[in-house]
């Protein structure tokens, strides 16, 4: 959530950001917000003046009653009218503040100067040359779906029978390989990268979704359990960031770094017509999430660190990948700057997103009320929050199976995973 003081002082800057994000329609909403803000400030001044008058006259009435000098009836009648006016103005003020909050929750975050301007994913910048590993794929390739079916390690048909399309089933060595990936990534982040492991709930309340920015704007992407008023998490970012909702952190605690495994659930509304084969687009998948809480001046260094931590996983697995800096028309609403890591699918002959690493500055912290007191200061300020996929296994599995396939249709297990799987070949 943006600071209303920043919006009031820099409306042209906010409008420019909305245009860069291709959200010109929100400029009218911005004007509406500024008008509500003007009305609110006027009302606050008026009510404060009336409350000051009421306090003064109440003391005068008390003196008259105590001394018996004169009648206080006229003043009492006048103050009742003032009290009624204050009550009506407070009610109007509450309605205005609700409207302001609704608009503030819907506005996207400001953009970092490094973010390139662009309309869509086609205009994202490749900021790191593709990292390649020689897997000697000089034979007719199978895609991950055919490999999974042939080897009996994936079953999308039975997943569809159980739950519907987009719910995969891992079987035998496929399940073991998935678990190995997750354990390897968690161990790498906690033992090598300094993260504290968290195992969060997979269902959250509305306040948690609001805190990280999925609610209300992206509510249609989230699975909802109406009877219990709970939501299935789209990412561990939601519960882990909300660990510190409504908390005042200590300066010496920062930065805080968490790594969490979770299943992720996404409706993917509006994805019809896109390539939905196999793992390319699913409703349930597994992911390791990295989440950081930092001092404001340290957050962009922390973003680069998160990116390095995610890349370290792919380098250890020897998975080909590239890094993109997202443009203004493709970056998520809450992020000020975001890198995507895409892994190479040799069968699809294209890169697939496997990780997003984002800095939200104080956007989520304002929504979730996460603050700290800087050393030497008595005034609290908001932390900066960051997160990154470290990584999502669905598309990572696509790249792993396809890059590690052999001419015989078997899968060589990456060396770093063998201590977790207990085998080096899937046949």
UniProtKB/Swiss-Prot annotation:
<feature type="binding site">
    <location>
        <begin position="266"/>
        <end position="268"/>
    </location>
    <ligand>
        <name>ATP</name>
    </ligand>
</feature>
<dbReference type="InterPro" id="IPR015866">
    <property type="entry name" value="Ser-tRNA-synth_1_N"/>
</dbReference>
<keyword id="KW-0030">Aminoacyl-tRNA synthetase</keyword>
<dbReference type="Pfam" id="PF02403">
    <property type="entry name" value="Seryl_tRNA_N"/>
</dbReference>
<dbReference type="Pfam" id="PF00587">
    <property type="entry name" value="tRNA-synt_2b"/>
</dbReference>
<comment type="function">
    <text>Catalyzes the attachment of serine to tRNA(Ser). Is also able to aminoacylate tRNA(Sec) with serine, to form the misacylated tRNA L-seryl-tRNA(Sec), which will be further converted into selenocysteinyl-tRNA(Sec).</text>
</comment>
<keyword id="KW-0547">Nucleotide-binding</keyword>
<feature type="binding site">
    <location>
        <position position="389"/>
    </location>
    <ligand>
        <name>L-serine</name>
    </ligand>
</feature>
<dbReference type="GO" id="GO:0004828">
    <property type="term" value="F:serine-tRNA ligase activity"/>
</dbReference>
<dbReference type="InterPro" id="IPR010978">
    <property type="entry name" value="tRNA-bd_arm"/>
</dbReference>
<dbReference type="InterPro" id="IPR002314">
    <property type="entry name" value="aa-tRNA-synt_IIb"/>
</dbReference>
<dbReference type="InterPro" id="IPR002317">
    <property type="entry name" value="Ser-tRNA-ligase_type_1"/>
</dbReference>
<dbReference type="InterPro" id="IPR045864">
    <property type="entry name" value="aa-tRNA-synth_II/BPL/LPL"/>
</dbReference>
<feature type="binding site">
    <location>
        <position position="289"/>
    </location>
    <ligand>
        <name>L-serine</name>
    </ligand>
</feature>
<feature type="binding site">
    <location>
        <begin position="235"/>
        <end position="237"/>
    </location>
    <ligand>
        <name>L-serine</name>
    </ligand>
</feature>
<comment type="subunit">
    <text>Homodimer. The tRNA molecule binds across the dimer.</text>
</comment>
<feature type="binding site">
    <location>
        <begin position="353"/>
        <end position="356"/>
    </location>
    <ligand>
        <name>ATP</name>
    </ligand>
</feature>
<keyword id="KW-0436">Ligase</keyword>
<feature type="binding site">
    <location>
        <position position="282"/>
    </location>
    <ligand>
        <name>ATP</name>
    </ligand>
</feature>
<protein>
    <recommendedName>
        <fullName>Serine--tRNA ligase</fullName>
        <ecNumber>6.1.1.11</ecNumber>
    </recommendedName>
</protein>
<dbReference type="InterPro" id="IPR033729">
    <property type="entry name" value="SerRS_core"/>
</dbReference>
<keyword id="KW-0963">Cytoplasm</keyword>
<comment type="similarity">
    <text>Belongs to the class-II aminoacyl-tRNA synthetase family. Type-1 seryl-tRNA synthetase subfamily.</text>
</comment>
<keyword id="KW-0648">Protein biosynthesis</keyword>
<dbReference type="InterPro" id="IPR006195">
    <property type="entry name" value="aa-tRNA-synth_II"/>
</dbReference>
<dbReference type="GO" id="GO:0005524">
    <property type="term" value="F:ATP binding"/>
</dbReference>
<dbReference type="GO" id="GO:0005737">
    <property type="term" value="C:cytoplasm"/>
</dbReference>
<keyword id="KW-0067">ATP-binding</keyword>
<dbReference type="GO" id="GO:0006434">
    <property type="term" value="P:seryl-tRNA aminoacylation"/>
</dbReference>
<comment type="pathway">
    <text>Aminoacyl-tRNA biosynthesis; selenocysteinyl-tRNA(Sec) biosynthesis; L-seryl-tRNA(Sec) from L-serine and tRNA(Sec): step 1/1.</text>
</comment>
<dbReference type="InterPro" id="IPR042103">
    <property type="entry name" value="SerRS_1_N_sf"/>
</dbReference>
<dbReference type="GO" id="GO:0016260">
    <property type="term" value="P:selenocysteine biosynthetic process"/>
</dbReference>
